[in-house]
């Protein structure tokens, strides 16, 4: 009976395992979680090793959980405590008696592309990892689509700017051409002008038309001849003289013998009104326009017959003298060779 009892005690001793209490902390993003308490069986009679703690954590919290952290133990150093980094085969020294304190710091992986630290995560459930991959894929796809839309919008805006720029350039060119073609603006009726200055201005307009038609026709009068003919026309109405020159006809509508009558008529207008009254308004904007056919002028106030008779009697004495002076000023001797048609 004594031998049986001794053998039973010997068999029971190896079956009894030593278990030590361990307190550990988990550090995530620089913060310590609430402490955890576990009991770790010892694999060696020498004491506790880190591999014993890792095996216990894998059994309790899933395989590979402990590999996500770097472990260190609390040790006394001089008058304080320090964290002592450990590897799998390192021995863990107790703090006081059989008290073990560990800390697990989350391992950080350096991302070479972005230069930032990202935590290494390993999920136990594969379905969650597939969902994460799907989210990442969708996010990347959305980013690519957004980038494509932005590029398309940028190209569209560039095309629109180019399309808008070309009409603006055309409008600017047309505006510049019109400004170059337009001569001095027409003066109002209130500005006093003489008949000679108006005829000279109209003559310059006709000269522009004549210069443009020189390349098309062969037989044309020179600008100097046209100007001389206009000056020699005297007080002849521009409506009668102008169109003949614009049409390229070399024959003038002026008739000899009627010059004195027209001079008297112009003199009456100058004396009665004190300024030139244009019955036919003509402006230049690239071409001659006769606005008399489009607009009707406001009828001017007519003088009474007695007023006209009295005024004509007072001016009768000086009419002939002033007519001769005006004829001398308007009529200039011409060279027959310079003008094709005689006025």
Swiss-Prot record:
Gene3D superfamilies linked: SH3 Domains
Residue ranges, annotated region (Disordered): 148-194
Signal peptide as annotated in the record: none
A cellular component annotation (GO) from this entry: plasma membrane
Top-rank taxon: Eukaryota
Annotated GO MF terms: protein homodimerization activity
Subcellular location(s) per record: Cell membrane
Expression by tissue: Expressed during embryogenesis and in roots.
Region (DIX-like oligomerization domain): 18-109
Membrane protein topology class: Peripheral membrane protein
One Pfam match: SOK
A single BP term in Gene Ontology: regulation of root morphogenesis
Glycoprotein in keyword set: no
Key words, A-Z: Auxin signaling pathway, Cell cycle, Cell division, Cell membrane, Developmental protein, Membrane, Stress response
Comp. bias regions, Polar residues: 184-194
Locus of motif Association to cell membranes: 233-234
Keyword Cytoplasm: no
Sequence similarity: Belongs to the SOSEKI family.
Domain comment quoted from the record: The DIX-like oligomerization domain is required for polymerization, edge localization and biological activity.
Known partners and oligomeric status: Homodimer. Forms long polymer filaments with other SOKs proteins polymers (e.g. SOK1, SOK2, SOK3 and SOK4) crucial for polar localization and biological activity. Binds to ANGUSTIFOLIA (AN).
Further details from the record: 'Soseki' means cornerstone in Japanese.
Function as written in the Swiss-Prot or TrEMBL entry: SOSEKI proteins (SOK1-5) locally interpret global polarity cues and can influence cell division orientation to coordinate cell polarization relative to body axes, probably by guiding ANGUSTIFOLIA (AN) polarized localization. Positive regulator of auxin (indole-3-acetic acid, IAA) biosynthesis and signaling pathway leading to the modulation of seedling growth, plant and inflorescence development. Negative regulator of stress responses (e.g. salinity and osmotic stress).
Name under which the protein is recorded: Protein SOSEKI 4
Species the sequence originates in: Arabidopsis thaliana
